[in-house]
Amino acid sequence: MAITYDTYEDLWEHSEVLEGVHEVLSEVAEVDGVPAISEAFLRGIDEDRGHKHVVAMNGDRVAGVLAIDPDRVIELAVAPEVRHSRVGIALFEALRDQLGVSGGIDVWAHGDSAGAQRFVESLDARRTRELLKMSVDCPPATKAAKAMEAGGAEAEKRCAEQDFEVLSYTESVARFDADSVDAEWVRINNEAFAWHPEQGGWDVDYLRSARDTNWFDPDGVLMLWVRDENSAAERVGIPCAANGGEGNDDVFRLVGFHWTKIPLEEKEKDAGERTGEVYVVCLADDARGRGLGQAITQLGMKSLLENGCGRIELYVEGDNAPAVSTYKRLGFEVVHTDVVYRGRL
């Protein structure tokens, strides 16, 4: 039976196709040992995020899917049983011929398998970005877990000695208010990630959309605050007086945060068997060089341990040598590499 290729600008509205797409994505992840589609692109499949899609159909069964976002970044998956049958190439041809996409494109290869490398070579693509997945095993009562607990306690002490206050997102909103806290969150995020293609340039609406997931836990976001007594006319932060503080010259500034993640399916596992993630670690420019980046990382890891995680994972840019070095000191090892290849249609 010939494989056909259908295009969608509203895939999320086609429930019968969505079911087949998710089935093939599950099969690909099981066979390859790594998901072919990232969290952001999964959301682009299930809801309107401006993504377009090409779906390969082998009769009534989904045989592959290609997704492209508004920035011309592409992710795709091909069912194991139809690999080496030009399905991947045909998905790109349909993207060009049916959706009219041509010119430069960036293609993610999650896991960067030998098959993926051969495929992108056929597109005359070059390697432009590496994203490392690192992990550390830390079951309860093991040496690694005890070291993390001790590191977290030391981090709490280090923050207190420098007059920084660690509050969860829940506690921060109770102390101040949601709009002010979210504004500070976005300010610090964009300052730290001005260079980042996905993490930078956020606004409050985008932040709230990013938090709108089944796994988000406001107590899993640790925020580092400092009381600023600087009397300069132009300052950022949250005025103390507006929130029950004393005086009009003080503000609380956010200087960093650690957004941790425990997927919903992991929360259903027994304590000690869950996998958590160092999801986003962020530090203000003027707070660097004081050991706070490692401290807030350790605080989040301690929180993940306390919430039953026996393994912790993270993703980091391959060319971010200081961060990779820090994570290795904390016991993390590289387990696989995701790669972006740049080519042309």
Swiss-Prot record:
Organism this protein belongs to: Corynebacterium jeikeium (strain K411)
Keyword list, A-Z: Acyltransferase, Repeat, Transferase
Family of the protein in this entry: Belongs to the acetyltransferase family. MshD subfamily.
Binding site for 1D-myo-inositol 2-(L-cysteinylamino)-2-deoxy-alpha-D-glucopyranoside: E39, E198, K261, E277, Y315
Reactions catalysed according to its record: 1D-myo-inositol 2-(L-cysteinylamino)-2-deoxy-alpha-D-glucopyranoside + acetyl-CoA = mycothiol + CoA + H(+)
Role summary: Catalyzes the transfer of acetyl from acetyl-CoA to desacetylmycothiol (Cys-GlcN-Ins) to form mycothiol.
Name of the protein in question: Mycothiol acetyltransferase
Positions bound to acetyl-CoA 2: V281, C282, L283, R288, G289, R290, G291, L292, G293, Q294
EC number annotated for this UniProt entry: 2.3.1.189
Gene Ontology BP annotations: mycothiol biosynthetic process
Subunit annotation: Monomer.
The keyword Phosphoprotein belongs to this UniProt entry's keyword annotation: no
Family matches, as Gene3D superfamilies: 3.40.630.30
Major enzyme class: transferase
Binding site for acetyl-CoA 1: L76, A77, V78
Family matches, as Pfam families: Acetyltransf_1
Keyword Acyltransferase: yes
InterPro entries (UniProt xref): Acyl_CoA_acyltransferase, GNAT_dom, MshD_Acetyltransferase, Mycothiol_AcTrfase
GO MF, any single term: mycothiol synthase activity
N-acetyltransferase domain mapped to chain residues: 6-149, 164-345
